[in-house]
């Protein structure tokens, strides 16, 4: 029904479930996002009550726990190999400074966040194939940022739109 509704104005979409695609850690060294994704999936599977029942009865939730599994594995290996027995909060500690190529990139040393449009890599092709199959109403792309440099991007706010973005991309 969801795909039919995209091409048919006579379909009553209010009776269809909303499709949500949640993607995490496109940069493998942003590991807290993949961990948050697993916690969110667990919550959705384990929670009880009318609110969660209503959400799950009216929503199709697609999880991609790691857009970049190769980078996440590389980062996890680095962090686990270089961590101290006692957590070291010093930002200059070796654990927090990966050597090249680090976990940001995938197996081919490519920044997966730059492959949304060209769709050259296997991970991106699989992701786009899933998008074409489900046509999600909502897509989330969870990133990790420094504690003093976070921001929230909300499409549709005129003051947040780059003036070089063509109007057709905004419509």
For the regions a language model picked out, list residue spans one by one.
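Surface-exposed loop and adjacent secondary-structure segments within mature catalytic domains
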Residues: 1-2, 7-17, 37-40, 53-119, ...
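Sec-exported extracytoplasmic/periplasmic mature domains
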Residues: 42-49, 117, 132-136
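Second-shell loop/turn segments in exported
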Residues: 23-30, 113-117, 166
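Short HxH-centered metal-ligating active-site micro-motif
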Residues: 11, 16-32
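Proline-aspartate-enriched helix->loop->beta-strand connector
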Residues: 131-145
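Short, intrinsically disordered, charge-balanced linker/junction segments flanking boundaries
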Residues: 167-171
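Short amphipathic alpha-helical face segments that pack within enzyme cores
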Residues: 35-43, 126
